[in-house]
Amino acid sequence: MPTQTPPLALRVAEIPPFHVMQVVAEAAALEAKGMDVIHLEVGEPDFSTPSDVLAAAQDAMASGHTRYTDARGLPALRDAISAWYASQGLAISAERIQITQGASGALLLAAAATVNPGEQVLMADPAYPCNPRFVEAVGGAVHWLRTEATDAFQPSAAMLRRSACAEDHVLMLAHPANPTGMAVPAAELRAMVSWCQDTGRHLIVDEIYQPLSFEGELQSSLHLGQDHFVVGSFSKYFNMTGWRLGWLVMPEYAVSACQKLAQHLFICAPTTAQHAALACFRPDVLAEADARKEILKSRRDFLIPRLRALGFDIPMMPDGAFYVFADASALTENSQAFCVDLIRKTGVALTPGNDFSQALPPTWIRIAFTETEARLDEALRRIEDYLAC
């Protein structure tokens, strides 16, 4: 007799598709046929993990460091992160640092600690598409804040005072943000930290791109207050995307709760990755990371004028990360169709902007400057030829 398949949870059906996956699938199919694909769709630079980090991982495995760690993370790694913050003028106790399975693990942990079923999280549109999923996974909902290019696609304290309601218990910021690369302006960040404190709301700030700032040192939100959550990661600045390692700085009031959640949700972050990450804070590795940041800045400065010349509207230079968020309305009415047709005809992979925004018109595109300048130049040449047809 046929068996009846039980229904899956409603949350699965409610998750919107990753539109870029159509581009990724097209790219894979083309590469399988031998086409040279230029990948400007994935948030992962072409840099490899630093050699000192690789050596530390090999040493850890050879020494048998493959078992569980404390759920909070290796004490030495938490101390190293604390010292890294101290080098920025911040006193962050290692007791307030939780090692996580990537920044995603940190965001999920922060959401689980702060959001009750039915409560809302204030979040800017556009946003990284996984962030609302963390909120929904713990039974919350997102209260979207529509932002504009003139506001650096970031919310403001005035917007919060105007839009927040009783159901909004958390504000989540990204500093700088994906897909825009724009940081929260300093005055607005200070005002929003104060607003959360004054109104009794939690604040979660995703700072995984904060070390990758191009216009001087971008200060952490922790300089403005210590009573909120900050997410960090080894993925972007230290080029450890596949190692799945991040951290969460917790306010004192949430340390015990987050540790309890981490014990039950994750057991621990990957042990070998933790031992490897200890090498990230050596002076030579930090110097290498900063040198790579300068390379990314050079790529940004090379790419944006050329994109503008092709007809892409880029309202402002990104402050950090490695993304350009461009309005292609002069070139297309549908960025999804544009990106799919572009990859098929040229082998240049870009990300349609509808993955990031419910409010913006469907003409925006995210372009990652994660390839060499020579490859970026080739991508631009192909796009120019495509537009000329």
For each feature predicted by the language model, list its residue ranges:
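N-terminal small-domain helix-loop-helix segment of the aminotransferase-like
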Residues: 2-102, 109, 280-283, 387-389
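PLP-dependent enzyme catalytic core of the Aspartate aminotransferase-like
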Residues: 83, 91, 332, 341-350, ...
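Short acidic capping loops at alpha-helix termini that bridge into adjacent secondary structure
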Residues: 92-97, 117-120, 226-227
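Conserved PLP-anchoring active-site segment centered on the Schiff-base-forming lysine
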Residues: 113-135
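A short helix->loop->beta-strand "cap" motif at the edges of active sites that frequently abuts
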Residues: 119, 140, 198-202, 226
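Active-site phosphate-binding strand-loop segment of PLP-dependent enzymes
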Residues: 148-216
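Conserved core segment of the aminotransferase class I/II
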Residues: 226-294, 304-306, 386-387
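Conserved glycine-rich beta-strand-loop-beta hairpin in the small C-terminal domain of fold type I
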Residues: 278, 294-304, 315-328
